[in-house]
Amino acid sequence: MIDMRSIQKSFGANIVLNGVDFEVLPGEVHALMGENGAGKSTLIKVLTGIYERDGGTIVVNGREVHYRHPKEAERDGIVVIHQELNVIPTLTVAENIFLGREPKIGRTGVIRYKEMEQQAASYLRRLGMDLDPRELAGRLSVGKQQMIEIARAISTNAKCLIMDEPTAALTEREIQALFSVIPTLKQQGVAVVYISHRMEEIFTICDRISVLRDGQFIGTKRVKETNFDEIVQMMVGRQIGERFPKRRVTIGEERLRVERLTKKGLFENVSFSVRAGEVLGVAGLMGSGRTEIMEAIFGARPFDEGDIYIDGRPVRIRSPRQAVEHGIAMITEDRKQKGLILEMSVHENLTLPKLEQLATAGFIQSSKERDVVLTYIHLLNIKASSPDLPVKALSGGNQQKVVFGKWLAMNPRILILDEPTRGVDVGAKKEIYEVINELAAQGAAIIMISSELPEVLGMSDRVMVVHEGKVQAILENDGLDQETIMRAATGGNR
């Protein structure tokens, strides 16, 4: 259906795509993989007419094309479903599906709502979705809004859906709903290009995997004929060893204890502890209250009652400043909104929490600042052409490393990580895991929220499972499996 050959694209002297080949067959699910900055997004933008290619050919349905706008690609059945969904919350499900293509009475401009709602219901049924076409889209979950986008694509007679990190903001149940829709699309001859860093998903639903590295096409493999290690080596150009690096840490005394922490409507009677050198994994479905509990401990969210102890002593924390004073740092799941100031440089972001220590008589000592910046750029292997580069210019993985560096610079004794590797490629994940292990080895107590159960199992000493704002279970990670965690996360027996 789609055949891209020898695609070239440069921005100035920077070669972003260098002779890339990419082929998509009708009715297949084809993963497009590569580290952050490998060229995946640029390739899709070239395909759909957002960027003009410098060289190479694109053939769609046997005809060479040269799209100038995504609308032209859509007319040929190529539709992109972006990570940031394009759903208008104040319109109904049906209005979103037919936006700009509403059936009307002659030339009057009057919309035939009943017909539109019936057609919308028909497209939703094709996806196995029982959604009311008259429901306001803003009242639906992210997963159901994503189904609206898929229904919209099918209504335009889409032949190829390009999904960019489609499960990043979905609950486990919504992910399963998406996975049940994809075979339906395949049966209807619709191809799916699936862009994701989540290996488990790739090997579950994809037929073939194509890998880019540093703007070059490395190869295509059939999922049945490859494995995790081979794909990782294709992506990073080297063997990265064990997926989750082993730790040799002696777990020390209790560092943090929380008792009966409660915020009405969000979480209730939460009690747990974490020791020096320990990694406590926190699992639970999206919306279970995991993040809200940790925000309360960090002083970013008020709570009604409960006590927090550090090294056995009660502490009062009502703001992030007070948390930082007690040696607590928190790396948030939304790095762009809460973790970074995107317009500021790498070095400015790295030194934000440490400005007081870098100042003498109220003036920042530039030599001290430079030493701190270079130390953490080197330690975390942050790929930036200059420390003065705006942090928004970095890849997702390198942005996440800057967030880590920002808080590591204050030498935290307790580090709370909320989805630390979301949207990060496999090579950068391994580097982040090694940093977590190093911090634990230095005696920090680590709390790690993650929706990726292999990550929870691979990195944690114990796992706390949260369900509907309550601690459902605290499990030793000795022979623990994903099924046991999911059973607790859905309210089942421990």
UniProtKB/Swiss-Prot annotation:
Keyword Nucleotidyltransferase attributed: no
- Listed EC numbers: 7.5.2.7
Q: Which GO terms describe its cellular component?
A: plasma membrane
Q: According to its UniProt record, where is this protein located?
A: Cell membrane
Is Disulfide bond tagged as a keyword? Answer: no
Membrane-topology descriptor: Peripheral membrane protein
Question: GO MF terms on file?
Answer: ABC-type D-ribose transporter activity; ATP binding; ATP hydrolysis activity
Q: Which PROSITE patterns match?
A: ABC_TRANSPORTER_1, ABC_TRANSPORTER_2, RBSA
Q: Where does ATP bind?
A: 34-41
Which reactions is this enzyme annotated as catalysing? Answer: D-ribose(out) + ATP + H2O = D-ribose(in) + ADP + phosphate + H(+)
Q: Keywords for this entry? A: ATP-binding, Cell membrane, Membrane, Nucleotide-binding, Repeat, Sugar transport, Translocase, Transport
Q: Which InterPro entries match?
A: AAA+_ATPase, ABC_carbohydrate_import_ATPase, ABC_transporter-like_ATP-bd, ABC_transporter-like_CS, P-loop_NTPase
Entry-linked Pfam families: ABC_tran (PF00005)
Q: Indicate the quaternary assembly.
A: The complex is composed of an ATP-binding protein (RbsA), two transmembrane proteins (RbsC) and a solute-binding protein (RbsB).
Q: Which family does it belong to?
A: Belongs to the ABC transporter superfamily. Ribose importer (TC 3.A.1.2.1) family.
**What is this protein called in UniProt?**
Ribose import ATP-binding protein RbsA
Look up and give the organism this protein is from.
Answer: Geobacillus kaustophilus (strain HTA426)
The gene for this chain is rbsA
